[in-house]
Regions:
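Substrate-engagement module of ASCE P-loop NTPases
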Residues: 45-47
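Polytopic endomembrane small-metabolite transporters, centered on the Drug/Metabolite Transporter
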Residues: 83-85
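Canonical radical SAM enzyme core domain
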Residues: 57-61
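Receiver (REC) domain active-site loop signature in two-component systems and cognate sites
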Residues: 26
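N-terminal phosphate-binding loop and flanking beta/alpha elements of the actin-like ATPase fold
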Residues: 50
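Asp-based, Mg2+/Mn2+-dependent phosphohydrolase catalytic module
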Residues: 1-22, 30-33, 39-43, 66-79, ...
Length: 284
């Protein structure tokens, strides 16, 4: 297995690729503000190339765009935004036979269910559960054990609209829907995940691109850029495309606080994940 290559700048390799799948949280922003170097890098990518923002946000892309506008990240920086929420909606609309669901998550994610012909109901009347995250950003996982036990007792299938386990909002760590779903699985519950790192998320993205641009997608020309080994990089591995690992994102504390050499950390992780390129932060 080849060792990962450190990039002093994206400009060293960007000519090899035509499509860039760029993660948002941890690469473009930290939940509060954008990273200036990341914006400069995206600005420098030629217009003939495509920048596709992909996110495990459990909401439709138009809802995420409103948040991006608030942190001054507008549409001129990219061609398309696709979320795990978009794929979840596609599944619920086209493949879900059951119509009554229980929503396990905050009200801010309710846009996920608009115009799907589904009925939000109590747990007692639900046919399945859709999990979008914790109700309060400060919640611990233990708070959800009682409701998960009730869901398991009814033997309901859970749809997880965000496979991420945690996220860093500024300097604070918060649990995501993926952590609740994993806890439910440990109880013996059945979960279907939508988003990174699952192959069908990338297949869905490529189908959207093919329809929009009316041409076949060459996977050899795709570069995935992300900071999460378990979702972004593993997802690139699953889809068999090249990747650029941003080590200064969600995994930063694993090497930075331990005074571990970045290159040694990445090489060690390369035993479990195939990492092609890496940077501390996305830099042109």
């Amino acid at each position: 297995m080849n060792n990962p290559i450190f990039l002093s700048g994206l400009n060293k390799i960007y000519s090899k690729f035509d499509i860039f799948f760029v993660d948002l949280w941890g690469v473009v922003h930290n939940g509060i503000e954008c990273y200036s170097n990341s914006l400069k890098a995206l600005k420098n990518i030629e217009k003939r190339k495509k920048i596709i923002l992909i996110s495990n946000a459990p909401r439709p892309s138009h809802s995420v765009q409103k948040f991006l506008n608030k942190i001054n990240f507008n549409k001129k920086f990219y061609n398309l935004l696709i979320t795990s929420g978009d794929l979840t909606r596609f599944y619920l609309k086209n493949f879900s036979k059951n119509k009554c669901f229980y929503h396990l998550g905050p009200d801010r994610d309710k846009s996920l269910f608009i115009n799907l012909g589904l009925k939000k109901t109590s747990l007692n009347n639900a046919n399945f559960v859709v999990c979008t995250g914790v109700n309060n950003n400060k919640d611990s996982l233990s708070k959800y054990v009682p409701i998960l036990k009730k869901i398991k007792k009814k033997n309901l299938k859970m749809i997880c609209a965000n496979p991420d386990l945690i996220v860093h909002r500024g300097d604070r760590t918060e649990y995501c829907a993926g952590s609740i779903a994993k806890l439910y699985e440990k109880m013996g519950g059945k979960v279907k995940y939508f988003g990174k790192p699952y192959k069908y998320f990338y297949e869905y993205i490529c189908s959207v691109l093919k329809k929009k641009y009316r041409k076949n997608i060459n996977k050899n020309k795709i570069l995935v850029i992300g900071d999460n080994l378990n979702t972004d990089i593993f997802g690139a591995n699953n889809f068999k495309v090249k990747n650029l690992f941003i080590a200064g994102g969600i995994h930063k504390s694993e090497w930075n606080k331990k005074n571990t050499n970045l290159a040694n950390f990445v090489i060690k992780k390369n035993k479990d994940f195939k990492i092609n390129y890496f940077q501390n932060e996305l830099v042109w």
